[in-house]
C-alpha cells in the first residue's frame, strides 16, 4: 500500500512539472510582448516611428517626378473643385480613380469645413502618406520580432528608418509609395516559413488593394503568391475561398469606381498593363539598358546599406529564400522593360532592409561603427534631396500663388510655362482657376516615325514657336515661367514684348539638358508684379 501511495505522489509531482513547463512558455510570450514596447530615447517605439515619419514629411520640400502631382493631387482637385488638368493617361483610360479618390475625400472634408487652403490641400495628403508609411514600419518591426530575434527586429527597424530613399519617397503622393506600404503590410500577414502571424485573408486583401492602385504590384507578388500556392495543403480551398473571391471583389469595386468617374464601363488594370507592358509606351519617356537596375537602380535605392544587405544575403537561411528570390525576380522582370525608374523598385526596399538587419545583428565588434556610418551616409543624401535638390518646382508655385487674388478680375493673369512638360505641379498647388498653359508631351499612339510632341517642337526652335503661337501682342500671356537655361535663347522675344524678370528661384545644383539651375518668372504688366518679398 505504501508503494502505491509513493507512486501516486511521484505521478502527481510529474504532472506538476508539466504544468510548470506550460507556465514557462507563457512567460516567454510575455517577454515578447515586453519586447514590442522597446523604447528609443525613452519613447515607445511606435510613437518614435510616427514622430520620425512626421519629421520626414516636414523635411521633404522638393519634387521628385511629375506623377506625384499629376496622377494624384491634380485629379483629386478636379474631382472636388471642378478644375484641374487631366494628362493623356486619363483620356486613354489607363489610370484608376481609386487612388485620387482617397485624396478627393480629404479635399471634400476640408471644403465642407471651409479649410480648403492651399497649404492644407498640399500638406494633408502628405501627412496621410507619412502615417501610412509609419504604420507599415511598425508592422514590419513586429513581423521580424516574432519571425527572427529581437536583435534582428531592432536593426531591421533602424535600417528602414535611416534609408535615404525611404525618407525621400515615403511621404510623397505617388502610387509607388502606397504600393510599397501595402506590400510591407501584406508581408506581415504572409505565411513566411516559421511565421506566426500569417492570415491569407488579410495579406491577399492588401495585395489586391496594391494591385488596384498600381497593377504592376503583381510583379512583386507573383513569386510570393505562387510559393504560397505550392506549399499550401488545400490548394482548391485556397483558390475558391481566398484567391477568387478576394480578387473578384477588389477588381469589381475598382471597376465600378473607375466606370462611374469615366462615365463608361472600363477595365483600367488591363489598359494599364496593355499600354505600359505590352505596348511599352513608357519607352517614349526614355529608355535604359537592360542592366540598369542591377548596376544603378538597386545600388542607388539601397544606397549605403548595400554592403550590409549583401552580407545579410550571405547569412540568410532557407526561410529567407523566398524574400531573396522576390527581390531578384522583381528586378529581373522590370529589367525587361525599356523605361526604367528608381521608384519602380521601391517596393522591394523593405525586403532588402530585412537582410540589412540580419547583417547588423550578426556584427558584434563592428556593429556601432557600421550603424554610425550607415546613419551618417544616409543622412546627407536624405537632407540634400529632401530640402535642396529640385525644390524650385514647388517654390515657384508658392511665388505664383498671390496671383490668385486677381483670378476673378476683368483682366485676370495668364501664365505660360516654357519648361519640359509637367516640370511643376498645377492647380493642386495654386487652388484658383487661373488660365494656365504648359508645353504638352503625350506619346504618339498612331505609330508615326516622325512624331514630335509640343515640348520637342518648342525646344527645337523656341523663337519660331513663340512668334508663330503669339503673332499679336494682345494674345500674349501676362507671365512666363521658364528655366534660366532658356533665357538667352529667347531674350530678344522678351525684350520686344516688354517682359521683365520678376523672380529668380533656385531649383538645382545639377542643371541638365532643358532643366536649368534656376526658375525665372517674367511679367509684362507692372500691375501684375509679384510681391518682391517672394523673390528668391
From Swiss-Prot:
It is an enzyme of class 2 (transferase). Glycans are attached at residues 15, 176, 467. It is found in: Endoplasmic reticulum membrane. Its EC number is 2.4.1.-. GO terms for cellular component: endoplasmic reticulum membrane. GO terms for biological process: GPI anchor biosynthetic process. It comes from the Eukaryota. The chain crosses the membrane at residues 40-60, 118-138, 206-226, 243-263, 297-317, 322-342, 344-364, 369-389. Keywords: Endoplasmic reticulum, Glycoprotein, Glycosyltransferase, GPI-anchor biosynthesis, Membrane, Transferase, Transmembrane, Transmembrane helix. Pathway: Glycolipid biosynthesis; glycosylphosphatidylinositol-anchor biosynthesis. The keyword Magnesium does not apply. It is a multi-pass membrane protein. InterPro entries: GPI_mannosylTrfase. GO terms for molecular function: alpha-1,2-mannosyltransferase activity. The keyword Transmembrane applies. Alpha-1,2-mannosyltransferase that catalyzes the transfer of the third mannose, via an alpha-1,2 bond, from a dolichol-phosphate-mannose (Dol-P-Man) to an alpha-D-Man-(1->6)-2-PEtn-alpha-D-Man-(1->4)-alpha-D-GlcN-(1->6)-(1-radyl,2-acyl-sn-glycero-3-phospho)-2-acyl-inositol intermediate to generate an alpha-D-Man-(1->2)-alpha-D-Man-(1->6)-2-PEtn-alpha-D-Man-(1->4)-alpha-D-GlcN-(1->6)-(1-radyl,2-acyl-sn-glycero-3-phospho)-2-acyl-inositol (also termed H6) and participates in the nineth step of the glycosylphosphatidylinositol-anchor biosynthesis. Belongs to the glycosyltransferase 22 family. PIGB subfamily. This is GPI alpha-1,2-mannosyltransferase 3. It comes from Danio rerio.
Amino acid at each position: 500500500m505504501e508503494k502505491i501511495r509513493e507512486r501516486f505522489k511521484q505521478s502527481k509531482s510529474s504532472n506538476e512539472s508539466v504544468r510548470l513547463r506550460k507556465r514557462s512558455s507563457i512567460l516567454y510570450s510575455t517577454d515578447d510582448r515586453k519586447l514590442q514596447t522597446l523604447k528609443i530615447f525613452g519613447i515607445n517605439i511606435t510613437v518614435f516611428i510616427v514622430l520620425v515619419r512626421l519629421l520626414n514629411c516636414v523635411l521633404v520640400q522638393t519634387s521628385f517626378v511629375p506623377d506625384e502631382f499629376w496622377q494624384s493631387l491634380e485629379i483629386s482637385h478636379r474631382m472636388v473643385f471642378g478644375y484641374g488638368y487631366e494628362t493623356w493617361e486619363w483620356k486613354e483610360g489607363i489610370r484608376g480613380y481609386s487612388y485620387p479618390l482617397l485624396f478627393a475625400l480629404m479635399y471634400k472634408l476640408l471644403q465642407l469645413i471651409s479649410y480648403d487652403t492651399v497649404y492644407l490641400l498640399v500638406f494633408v495628403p502628405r501627412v496621410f502618406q507619412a502615417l501610412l508609411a509609419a504604420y507599415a514600419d511598425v508592422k514590419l518591426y513586429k513581423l521580424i520580432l516574432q519571425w527572427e530575434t529581437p536583435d534582428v527586429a531592432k536593426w531591421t527597424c533602424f535600417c528602414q528608418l535611416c534609408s535615404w530613399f525611404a525618407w525621400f519617397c515615403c511621404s510623397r503622393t505617388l502610387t509607388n509609395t502606397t504600393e510599397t506600404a501595402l506590400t510591407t503590410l501584406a508581408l506581415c500577414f504572409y505565411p513566411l516559413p516559421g511565421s506566426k502571424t500569417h492570415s491569407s485573408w488579410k495579406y491577399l486583401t492588401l495585395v489586391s488593394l496594391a494591385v488596384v492602385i498600381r497593377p504592376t504590384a503583381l510583379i512583386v507578388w507573383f513569386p510570393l503568391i505562387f510559393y504560397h500556392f505550392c506549399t499550401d495543403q488545400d490548394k482548391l480551398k485556397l483558390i475558391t475561398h481566398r484567391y477568387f473571391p478576394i480578387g473578384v471583389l477588389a477588381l469589381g469595386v475598382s471597376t465600378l469606381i473607375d466606370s462611374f468617374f469615366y462615365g463608361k464601363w472600363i477595365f483600367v488594370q488591363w489598359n494599364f498593363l496593355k499600354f505600359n507592358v505590352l505596348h511599352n509606351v513608357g519607352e517614349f519617356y526614355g529608355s535604359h539598358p537592360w542592366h540598369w537596375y542591377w548596376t544603378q537602380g538597386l545600388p542607388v535605392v539601397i544606397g549605403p546599406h548595400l554592403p550590409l544587405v549583401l552580407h545579410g544575403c550571405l547569412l540568410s537561411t532557407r526561410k529567407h529564400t523566398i524574400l531573396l528570390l522576390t527581390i531578384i525576380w522583381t528586378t529581373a522582370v522590370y529589367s525587361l522593360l525599356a523605361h526604367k525608374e528608381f521608384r519602380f523598385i521601391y517596393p522591394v526596399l523593405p525586403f532588402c532592409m530585412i537582410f540589412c538587419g540580419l547583417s547588423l545583428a550578426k556584427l558584434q565588434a563592428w556593429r556601432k561603427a557600421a550603424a554610425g556610418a550607415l546613419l551618417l551616409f544616409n543622412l546627407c543624401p536624405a537632407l540634400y534631396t529632401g530640402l535642396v535638390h529640385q525644390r524650385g518646382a514647388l517654390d515657384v508655385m508658392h511665388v505664383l500663388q498671390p496671383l490668385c487674388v486677381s483670378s476673378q478680375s476683368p483682366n485676370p493673369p495668364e501664365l505660360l510655362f516654357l519648361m519640359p512638360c509637367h516640370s511643376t505641379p498645377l492647380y493642386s498647388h495654386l487652388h484658383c482657376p487661373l488660365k494656365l498653359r504648359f508645353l504638352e508631351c503625350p506619346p504618339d499612339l498612331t505609330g508615326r516615325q516622325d512624331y514630335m510632341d509640343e515640348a520637342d517642337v518648342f525646344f527645337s526652335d523656341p523663337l519660331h514657336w513663340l512668334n508663330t503661337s503669339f503673332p499679336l501682342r494682345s494674345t500674349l500671356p501676362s507671365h512666363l515661367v521658364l528655366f534660366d537655361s532658356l533665357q538667352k535663347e529667347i531674350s530678344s522675344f522678351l525684350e520686344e514684348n516688354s517682359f521683365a524678370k520678376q523672380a529668380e528661384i533656385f531649383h538645382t545644383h545639377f542643371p541638365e539638358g532643358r532643366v536649368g539651375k534656376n526658375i525665372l518668372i517674367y511679367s509684362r504688366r507692372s500691375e501684375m508684379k509679384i510681391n518682391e518679398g517672394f523673390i528668391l
